[in-house]
Design a protein with these regions (language model features):
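Short hydrophobic beta-strand that contains or immediately precedes a catalytic carboxylate
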Residues: 1-6
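Rhodanese-like catalytic fold shared by cysteine-dependent sulfurtransferases
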Residues: 8-40, 49-83
Length: 83
């Protein structure tokens, strides 16, 4: 699962197709939900900083998570390109 940890406003300006948005400051209150998904999580954000924090936070509670870094650099299709 691709987890975009930018703000809702940033996410709404464009995001990786199929990604889920939970802003970094809301990760803590969503840990149980994310752990129950039982899937590996790739975090992303605008620069890679917030996604790194989120990946460490998820990993600390036993969730398989890696920092995918800046979603801009992945060059995957975004919702803006698919419309």
């Amino acid at each position: 699962m691709i987890l975009d940890v930018r703000t809702a406003g940033e996410f709404n300006t464009g995001h990786i197709v199929g990604s889920k948005n939970i802003p970094l400051d809301s990760i803590g209150s969503n840990l149980s939900e994310l752990k129950n998904l039982n899937v590996p999580i790739i975090t992303c954000c605008a620069s890679g900083m917030r996604s790194g924090v989120a990946a460490r936070q998820l990993s600390s509670v036993g969730i398989t998570a890696v920092n995918g870094g800046s979603w801009y650099s992945v060059k995957l299709a975004t919702d803006q390109e698919c419309k």
